[in-house]
């Protein structure tokens, strides 16, 4: 199968990010052109190190650029309590000498977009700081973005505060800017990612699959978004799954606003499912997932990896 969709992946690895990066690299329908890192699950120095370790593990020459170390206006609040202090606890990666590109992520994204023969798809599975910086500094790049597919937000409950999902809550100002940008947005939030569970039976089969399966199994043993006994949630993998198997998702066009001011509600995505606010839709919001189909696709894409 010929790769047909050229993508840029913005990420904050992160254990479920590792699974998403594997899918982005090895799904035959995708052509990953650039990886950029952002502070989120852990510091940007750690997310960059983790992404470089993964690229070395897979012997991949995909370029990588380090991005924002802090949110636009706030101090970083990370998720080391979910992913471990390093962000990818549980596997001993081999030492390497790889380095990121000598330019920040938003400039690297700009360069790839402006040199592409046709608009590209951005995939953001961490806080939206780098995407906001791109749009702030180079608004002309929007014409070269086919769409933005993101993991973030929720039409209901949060996982970082009672109402806010982690990626949006870390940098709500960046998210608000992105949702106001006019980009075509597909939002894969907690409404679907909480359904994206890999079962214990699935997890137990990973080590026999290949080197990647062994590595991911080791990481999942240290992942605190679920457990090996009850299953683990693959939040970030949903964004990649939508690119390849959009029929697995039920989407609805909605107006989405990001709250930036509330003492208890900052980072909340206000998803106007019923159109009560009278605002035009600015996102396609995923509200349901074919879980069995998702698991089947994950098994297929992991099998493509070495």
UniProtKB/Swiss-Prot annotation:
GO terms for cellular component: cytosol. It is an enzyme of class 3 (hydrolase). It holds the Pfam family IU_nuc_hydro. Its EC number is 3.2.-.-. GO terms for biological process: purine nucleobase metabolic process; purine nucleoside catabolic process; pyrimidine nucleobase metabolic process. Keywords: Glycosidase, Hydrolase. Signal peptide: none annotated. The active site is at residue 235. GO terms for molecular function: purine nucleosidase activity. SUPFAM superfamilies: Nucleoside hydrolase. NCBIfam families: PRK10768.1. Belongs to the IUNH family. RihC subfamily. HAMAP family: Nucleosid_hydro_RihC. Hydrolyzes both purine and pyrimidine ribonucleosides with a broad-substrate specificity. This is Non-specific ribonucleoside hydrolase RihC. It comes from Salmonella paratyphi C (strain RKS4594). The gene is rihC.
């Amino acid at each position: 199968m010929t790769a047909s969709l050229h993508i840029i992946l913005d990420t904050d690895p992160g254990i479920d990010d590792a699974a998403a990066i594997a899918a982005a690299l090895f799904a035959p329908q995708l052509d990953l052109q650039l990886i950029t890192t952002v502070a989120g699950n852990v510091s940007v120095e750690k997310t960059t190190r983790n992404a470089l370790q993964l690229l070395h593990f897979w012997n991949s020459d995909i370029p990588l650029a380090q991005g924002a170390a802090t949110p636009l206006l706030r101090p970083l609040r990370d998720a080391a309590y979910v992913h471990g202090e390093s962000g990818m606890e549980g596997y001993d990666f081999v030492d390497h000498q790889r380095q990121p590109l000598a330019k920040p992520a938003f400039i690297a994204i700009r360069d790839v977009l402006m040199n592409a023969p046709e608009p590209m798809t951005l995939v953001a599975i961490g806080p939206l700081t780098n995407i906001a910086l791109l749009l702030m500094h180079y608004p002309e790049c929007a014409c070269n973005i086919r769409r933005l597919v993101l993991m973030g937000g929720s039409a209901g409950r949060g996982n970082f505060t009672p109402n806010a999902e982690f990626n949006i809550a870390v940098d709500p100002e960046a998210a608000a800017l992105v949702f106001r940008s006019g980009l075509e947005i597909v939002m894969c939030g907690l409404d679907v990612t909480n359904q994206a569970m890999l079962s214990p039976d699935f997890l137990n089969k990973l080590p026999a699959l290949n080197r990647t399966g062994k590595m991911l199994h080791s990481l999942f043993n240290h992942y605190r978004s679920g457990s090996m006994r009850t299953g683990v949630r693959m939040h970030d993998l949903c964004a990649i799954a939508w690119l390849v198997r959009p029929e697995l998702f039920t989407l609805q066009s909605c107006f989405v606003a990001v709250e930036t001011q509330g003492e208890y509600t900052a980072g909340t995505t206000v998803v106007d499912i019923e159109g009560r606010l009278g605002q035009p839709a600015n996102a396609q919001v995923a509200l349901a997932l074919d879980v069995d189909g998702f698991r089947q696709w994950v098994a297929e894409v992991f099998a493509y990896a070495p």
